[in-house]
């Protein structure tokens, strides 16, 4: 079973429909015990990192996420679900995040229109997550903040919006994307299908490059 964490994020129904479309064996969960028992975990999200972290802490999900990632359970973070993996966020003040990947969530430069809303191309590294997806394929973004990290090896996909920023990251069993695959048409569904296949067949190696 793939646990999809429900903490009140607005994009949950879209994420669920997309995962069901690619025939993922999902269960929407609010109980940390269900996350700990899952074969894989998805954290969708929209909104602010501070609000998301507050909700996760109140539910006891922050510790559950750390535990399952530490023991190798495949994990997919979407949009804010990617951002909360960072060490900290500068959104509405400095806030501590899960600290599972190196970096800080920072706002786009003041001269840019934010949030970035719409389609943008992703240059990817051709790893297994991107199998069958052309380099430069467009995905749907809605965000004002991005992951700033010095860990180049962490990044599997990049996008230009005022600067070159990480659109996707992967390490060991962690995979995360800044865009919304559930709103990104055929390539978003292809990416979700790839992740589901990797998560169910390769276990803790899902985030590895291939």
Curated annotation (Swiss-Prot):
Chief localization: cytoplasm
Pathway the protein contributes to: Amino-acid biosynthesis; L-histidine biosynthesis; L-histidine from 5-phospho-alpha-D-ribose 1-diphosphate: step 5/9
A GO CC annotation given for this chain: cytoplasm
Gene3D superfamilies hit by this protein: 3.40.50.880
UniProt xrefs under SUPFAM superfamilies: Class I glutamine amidotransferase-like (SSF52317)
Pfam families assigned: GATase (PF00117)
Catalytic site: 79, 180, 182
Keywords linked to the UniProt accession: Amino-acid biosynthesis, Cytoplasm, Glutamine amidotransferase, Histidine biosynthesis, Hydrolase, Lyase
GO biological process, one term: L-histidine biosynthetic process
The Glutamine amidotransferase type-1 domain, residue ranges: 1-205
InterPro entries registered for this protein in UniProt: Class_I_gatase-like, GATASE, Imidazole-glycPsynth_HisH
PROSITE patterns for the chain: GATASE_TYPE_1
CDD domains (alphabetical): GATase1_IGP_Synthase
Transmembrane segments: none
UniProt keyword Methyltransferase present: no
Subcellular location: Cytoplasm
Assembly and binders: Heterodimer of HisH and HisF.
Name of the protein: Imidazole glycerol phosphate synthase subunit HisH
Organism: Herpetosiphon aurantiacus (strain ATCC 23779 / DSM 785 / 114-95)
Gene: hisH
């Amino acid at each position: 079973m793939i646990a999809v964490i429900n903490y009140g994020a607005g994009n949950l129904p879209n994420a669920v429909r997309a995962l069901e479309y690619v025939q993922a064996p999902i269960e929407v969960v609010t109980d940390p015990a269900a996350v700990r028992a899952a074969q894989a975990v998805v954290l969708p999200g929209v909104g602010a990192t501070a609000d998301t972290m507050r909700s996760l802490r109140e539910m006891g999900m922050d510790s559950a996420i750390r535990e399952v990632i530490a023991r190798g359970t495949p994990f997919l973070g979407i949009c804010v679900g990617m951002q909360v993996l960072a060490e900290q966020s500068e959104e509405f003040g400095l806030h501590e995040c899960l600290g599972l990947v190196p970096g800080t969530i920072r706002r786009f430069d003041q001269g840019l229109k934010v949030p970035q809303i719409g389609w943008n191309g992703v240059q990817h590294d051709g790893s297994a997550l991107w199998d069958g997806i052309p380099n430069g394929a467009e995905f749907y973004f809605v965000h004002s903040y991005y992951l700033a990290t010095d860990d180049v090896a962490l990044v599997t996909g990049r996008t230009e919006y005022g600067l070159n920023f990480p659109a996707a990251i992967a390490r060991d069993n962690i995979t995360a994307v800044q865009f919304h695959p559930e709103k990104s048409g055929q390539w978003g569904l292809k990416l979700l299908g790839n992740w589901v296949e990797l998560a169910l067949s390769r276990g803790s190696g899902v985030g590895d490059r291939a």
